[in-house]
Amino acid sequence: MSNSVDTQSLMLQMRSLAAEAASQSQSVQKVEKGAQSAENFSDLLSQSVNAVATEQNKSSAMKTAFEKGEDVDLTEVMVQAQKASLSFQAMTQVRNKLVEAYKDIKNMPI
């Protein structure tokens, strides 16, 4: 009878060790995925800033072309200017939210 209790105890210990090992491997995978998502976030942020810069440059070029009298429609110039303005405003709001989140994290009690 004591033999069966020892076997059950041994099985419980083995299961708990297996569960612990599985959770540790999952946490390692989460850390690796977190590092990859950090790289992806920085890439995404960089691409977004570049896209806003492209919109601004395109708007500026269209305005200059219109002012020089080249064959550019005024409505296209205005639409592009609004696209550039909206994308810049959105980027500014994202920056503000990131700064706010950073300040919140910085001021958290340890």
Curated annotation (Swiss-Prot):
The keyword Isomerase does not apply. One of its GO terms (biological process) is bacterial-type flagellum-dependent cell motility. The keyword Thylakoid does not apply. GO terms for cellular component: bacterial-type flagellum basal body. One of its GO terms (molecular function) is cytoskeletal motor activity. InterPro entries: FliE. Keywords: Bacterial flagellum. It is found in: Bacterial flagellum basal body. Belongs to the FliE family. This is Flagellar hook-basal body complex protein FliE. The gene is fliE.
